[in-house]
Curated annotation (Swiss-Prot):
Keywords: Cytoplasm, Methyltransferase, S-adenosyl-L-methionine, Transferase. PROSITE patterns: SAM_MT_TPMT. InterPro entries: SAM-dependent_MTases_sf, Thiopurine_S-MeTrfase, TPMT. This is Thiopurine S-methyltransferase. It catalyses: S-adenosyl-L-methionine + a thiopurine = S-adenosyl-L-homocysteine + a thiopurine S-methylether. It comes from Francisella tularensis subsp. novicida (strain U112). One of its GO terms (cellular component) is cytoplasm. HAMAP family: Thiopur_methtran (MF_00812). GO terms for molecular function: thiopurine S-methyltransferase activity.
Amino acid sequence: MNKLETNNNQYWLDRWQNDDVGFCQESPNEFLVKHFSKLNINDSSVCLIPMCGCSIDMLFFLSKGVKVVGIELSEKAVLSFFSQNSINYEVIHGNDYKLYKGDDIEIYVADIFNLPKIANNLPAFDIWYDRGAYIALPNDLRTNYAKMMLEVCPNNTQILLLVMEHDKKSQTPPYSVTQAELIKNFSAKIKFELIDSKQRDNIPDYRKAEGMTKQYYTTYLRKKQY
């Protein structure tokens, strides 16, 4: 077990505290925008976004009329989101979480692995969007995360899962995730369809130093089950 598996929460809290958040995007994720139309959206749609940070993807969902429920460990990230986007909110204290509640958006400050404890407090959701949660977790924690999400997601939940695949195992996030791993961790209940794969043009120097020569952005979809 590596250091991140034993102290994953502190790793992410430190990165937010030190503003080491180069993963934050200035525009909605290109694969979310490209494949959003594949989701079955209606007036009551609610999207769960684990480890949401201050992602602008949340604004994209809101702009499409989809309510958002986020889970985020770093309170600094949550405050940044509401401040940067001038969204009014109220704060509600609960057991195992602190809730920042705005119009059509709720973000729970909590350890993602406390999700089963607070699941009954969440609005009913029909979409799970995962851009940065699964690939942020080391291998053992990804297995536990998948098991937990299967427990809290309704059977007909639509899932849009964005991951990365590398040609060399990485020691820091974002981690490489293969289709074989997803089948192993989710196949009991979830059947993912690979809908996109794009090779990254410019691999960061620190990845090249690890011996990495190829990276791919891969997108998986699990449609609503009827």
